């Protein structure tokens, strides 16, 4: 996986400059995950995010469909250059729930993560072209971990890395939530997350089995 976007392909740079201005773009590494590498592009007229990965067509299509349904980034450009896909997006407000600057206690993080997910899974997904429509399936995020959920003023404000979203088993997102809370805060907060979501009570062994369903 590439750790630097430089040099930016000409078409990518031109698209970014059309939005940010031609007075120089400053590239800043943002994060890296299994889904790709992301940079923050800063210019005189604002900020864009640039993701680079082998295949981002699915994520681009999902961002278009989810726009207006979930608080996802708006697409600013999509390119295939140098053997990879390059996805330009506008920023969404808020900070990731994994960010210490949020200042929340783990209990509040866990309960908010569960409450947000309950709302997301209640989204009307009629006509969703991704995943499988069958009884019990809902519109899932697909990688519902703390870094991918943004909040502002105590409310859900953004969702990123939606390349696996679509109709699916709600346990997919529940497993990711249990895993991310255990990874960042240790055991003990998964139950609060599940309670806030409204999931039936589970034994410790069942929660651990659910956690193990998450794999990235």
Model-derived segments and their meaning:
Residues 40-44, 90-91, 152:
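Active-site beta-strand termini and strand-to-loop segments that position acidic
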Residues 1-25:
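Juxta-kinase regulatory segment immediately upstream of eukaryotic protein kinase catalytic domains
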Residues 35-36, 47-87, 99-119:
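A conserved alpha-helical element in kinase catalytic cores
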Residues 143, 148:
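Conserved catalytic-loop position in the HRD/HxD motif
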Residues 85, 137-138:
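Residues on conserved beta-strands of the protein kinase catalytic domain
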Residues 138-140, 152-202:
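Active-site Asp-x-Gly
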Residues 87-95:
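Short pocket-lining segment of the protein kinase catalytic domain that shapes the ATP-binding cleft
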Residues 19-42:
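ATP-binding glycine-rich phosphate-binding loop
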């Amino acid at each position: 996986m590439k750790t630097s976007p430089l040099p930016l392909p000409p078409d990518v740079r031109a698209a970014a400059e059309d939005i940010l201005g031609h007075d120089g773009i400053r590239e800043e590494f943002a994060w890296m995950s299994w889904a790709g590498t992301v940079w923050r592009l800063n210019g005189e007229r604002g900020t864009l995010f640039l993701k680079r990965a082998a295949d981002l067509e699915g994520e681009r299509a999902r961002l278009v469909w989810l726009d207006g349904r979930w608080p996802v980034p708006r697409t600013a450009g999509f390119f295939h250059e140098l053997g990879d896909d390059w996805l330009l997006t506008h920023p969404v407000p808020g900070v990731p729930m994994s960010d210490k600057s949020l200042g929340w206690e783990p209990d509040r993080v866990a309960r908010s993560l569960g409450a947000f997910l309950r709302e997301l899974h209640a989204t009307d997904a009629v006509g969703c072209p991704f995943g499988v429509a069958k009884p019990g399936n809902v519109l899932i995020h697909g990688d519902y971990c703390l870094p991918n959920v943004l909040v502002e003023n105590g409310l859900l404000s953004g969702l990123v890395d939606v390349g696996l979203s679509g109709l699916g088993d709600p346990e997919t997102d529940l497993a990711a939530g249990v895993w991310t809370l255990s990874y960042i805060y240790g055991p003990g907060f998964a139950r609060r997350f599940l309670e806030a979501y409204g999931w039936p009570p589970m034994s410790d062994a069942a929660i651990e089995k659910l956690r193990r369903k998450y794999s990235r």
